[in-house]
Design a protein with these regions (language model features):
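Substrate-binding rim/cap in mid-to-C-terminal beta-strand-loop elements of soluble/periplasmic
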Residues: 82, 250-292, 303
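Active-site nucleophile/metal-coordination loop of metallo-enzymes that catalyze phosphate/sulfate
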Residues: 23-26, 39-122
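Beta-strand elements within well-structured catalytic alpha/beta cores of enzymes
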Residues: 26-39, 56, 81, 120, ...
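…; additionally, a secondary subgroup of soluble metalloenzymes is captured
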Residues: 8-9, 18-57, 128, 179, ...
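Active-site His/acidic residue clusters
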Residues: 139-153, 170-214, 218
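Metal-dependent active-site segment of extracytoplasmic phospho-/sulfohydrolases and closely related
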Residues: 31, 52, 208-252, 285
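Sec-dependent N-terminal signal peptides
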Residues: 4-13
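Catalytic-site neighborhoods of secreted/periplasmic enzymes
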Residues: 89-163
Length: 307
């Protein structure tokens, strides 16, 4: 009888693993986060300046109308992107926030709400997960304690470039080729800096967008070199746009940002018409991995973009 029970238990475990795997859309997800990347930046750029972004759009699913939460500032919106909550629920309401002005509706035990990194680690303990960023606040709001690898490096100081986007991107490509991560987030802060220093849609801003596109091409090649490209979903997202030399207001130039998804089981050439909010990003990543989401998350996955 004990042998029968053990066999049944083993079958149940295998079935549970198979069911979990069946829910996944891809084994690997790479999210490229671009700070200050306005939808208008894509509209204004010649296709020849952003060939990799255009390729992912033409062969993936996308919108240029993802809406930022208010106010349209970086920390507030990356927080929503990571933890599936609007401003009034996560409580991060000021520029450069690393904690909430009011208590969040939930806590991961590390002083912030559960993020996509938190729940992926809880539900898939064996995953390889990393994040590289050039703005230190990303480390404070993402839950680095859930990651295998996280690395911060400053790439700019005002108008001074300390490390080029091409050099910075090598940190991402090296990690991808060495570790073949299940989930990897790579954050570019240089475009937001270009907007503040020279103005959104200025020649310098557009040139920076062009250099980030080159970086995206290098990341795509690294995924191929690592042998995981065919089982990867690439997401490109942004926190806010901009106007003149700033953001934080309530104009559509500041609030509308791109969201591009390409890869395994993703529809090609599909501009989806449904509304999308910043906090839907976390829910969409959770859906790709087949994860259960926290009860208080308000984000919903963009299921319509998948085959």
């Amino acid at each position: 009888m004990k042998k029968v029970l053990l066999v049944l238990a083993a079958i149940c475990c295998i079935a549970a693993v198979d069911a979990s795997a069946a829910k996944k859309k891809a084994k690997h997800v790479v999210m490229i986060g671009i700070d200050g990347w306005a939808a208008e930046g894509i509209r204004k750029a010649p296709a020849s300046d952003i060939p990799n972004i255009r390729y992912l759009m033409e062969n993936g699913s996308w919108t240029l109308a993802k809406r930022s939460v208010m106010p349209s500032a970086s920390s507030i919106n990356w927080t929503s992107m990571f933890n599936g909550l609007p401003t009034e629920m996560h409580g991060f309401d000021k520029w450069n926030s690393t904690s909430g002005t009011i208590p969040s509706t939930s806590d991961n035990g590390h002083g912030i709400p559960p993020t996509i990194f938190t729940i992926l680690r809880q539900q898939r303990p064996a995953v390889e997960m990393g994040c590289v960023y050039d703005w230190d606040i990303i480390g404070a709001i993402s839950d680095t304690l859930a990651m295998d690898y996280h690395y911060f490096i400053k790439t700019y100081r005002g108008k001074e470039t300390m490390i080029t986007n091409d050099e910075y991107t090598k940190l991402a490509t090296d990690y991808i080729k060495e570790k073949k991560p299940d989930f990897f987030t790579f954050y570019y802060g240089s475009l937001d800096n270009a907007g503040h220093q020279y103005g959104w849609y200025s020649p310098e801003y557009m040139e920076c967008q062009k250099s980030i596109d080159r970086g995206i091409g290098l990341i795509i090649q690294a995924l191929k070199d690592a042998g995981i490209f065919e089982d990867t979903i690439i997401i490109i997202s942004a926190d806010h746009g901009g106007k003149d030399k700033g953001h934080g207001g309530f104009t559509m130039l500041e609030l509308e940002t791109p969201f591009i998804v390409y890869g395994k089981k993703v529809k090609g050439g599909f501009e989806f018409p449904e509304p999308m909010m910043q906090y839907d990003t976390a829910a969409t990543i959770a859906y790709i991995f087949g994860l259960d989401i926290p009860d208080d998350w308000r984000g919903k996955p963009m299921k319509q973009i998948f085959k």
